[in-house]
């Protein structure tokens, strides 16, 4: 699925992902490829993104985005936001 993470300051990430774990109002939830359409509010917490392929150039990432040793998992701390998934495209507006 295509993921776009946007903050008021910048576009933090845009790319193809396998799964995204999000801090929802009622706890953590995960969105996988081909998930049903959804709109949800987010609370303060950490977003975990499982990439479909390792990142080749991590130097261009915003400093809020952390990458694991395999370059296949991103984590981003957020203060809240909103997420919408339609047609296998996930748009995340984060604070």
Task: Name each model-derived stretch.
Residues 2-95:
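Compact, glycine-rich, soluble single-domain proteins
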């Amino acid at each position: 699925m295509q993921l776009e993470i946007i903050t008021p300051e910048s576009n933090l990430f845009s790319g193809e992902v396998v799964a995204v774990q999000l801090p929802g109002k009622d706890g953590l939830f995960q969105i996988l490829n081909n998930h049903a359409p959804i709109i949800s509010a987010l609370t303060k917490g950490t977003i975990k993104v499982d990439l479909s392929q390792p990142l080749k150039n991590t130097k261009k990432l915003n400093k809020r985005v952390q990458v694991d040793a395999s370059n296949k998992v991103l984590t981003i701390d957020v203060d809240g936001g909103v997420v919408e998934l339609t047609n296998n495209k996930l748009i995340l507006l984060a604070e």
